[in-house]
Design a protein with these regions (language model features):
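Conserved alpha/beta enzyme-core scaffold
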Residues: 1-193
């Protein structure tokens, strides 16, 4: 597989298909792979499940995919700044799997490490635990959470090399490292090669 591409569109060539799961790095709008998201929008791929810290804003980040109606499901921990996202969820046009932030990070890490699931106390006894397996450990209730795997992971790194090693700096070191590992394929946009 070629390691360096002329642009984001070329990097995603041959990887995209309707109904796929895409995990995208970033925290809020910091460290998001905006060029790869734009290439995904331009591809017209639809019925996507998108996984990330948030749903972007109306005209940037993952919000661009929502605006073009390419998404069927969102798995995220924060969704409060995107009016189109809110409209689609309330109208029943979009499925939402709201996941606590730490749990989402661990689900991504677990998926990347090949761990199918883990138990956590987070969300125990809440609506988020409904329909999930629960167990008692040391007299406390724990909820089973499954690891997340994606068909493609897209991230933004400060630096990368031709072997695929990535360096994330400062706030961009948020969800990018975990998301980089959870995809069958990872594509990144780096500032330096």
């Amino acid at each position: 597989m070629k390691k360096v591409y002329a642009d984001a569109t070329a990097a995603l060539q041959g990887l995209l298909h309707d109904g796929m799961t895409v995990a995208a790095g970033g925290f809020g709008l910091c460290g998001i792979p905006e060029n790869l998201i734009k290439a995904l929008v331009d591809s017209g791929t639809k019925d996507l499940t998108i996984v990330g810290n948030n749903a972007g804003v109306d005209d940037f980040g993952m919000g661009l995919l929502l605006k073009t109606r390419q998404v069927k499901k969102v798995i995220a921990s924060y969704v409060g700044e995107n009016k189109e996202f809110e409209r689609q969820v309330l109208a029943g046009e979009l499925e939402l799997q709201l996941t606590p932030q730490g749990t989402l990070a661990e689900k991504l890490r677990a998926g990347g490490a090949g761990i199918p699931g883990f138990y956590t106390r987070t969300a125990s006894g809440t609506l988020l635990a409904e329909g999930k397996d629960t167990r008692k450990f040391d007299g406390k209730d724990y909820v089973l959470e499954e690891g997340i795997r994606a068909d493609v992971a897209i991230v933004k790194a400060w630096k990368g090399d031709k072997s695929g090693n990535l360096v994330f700096r400062k706030t961009s070191r948020n969800f990018n490292p975990m998301i980089a590992t959870c995809g069958d394929v990872c594509k990144h946009r780096g500032s330096h090669l």
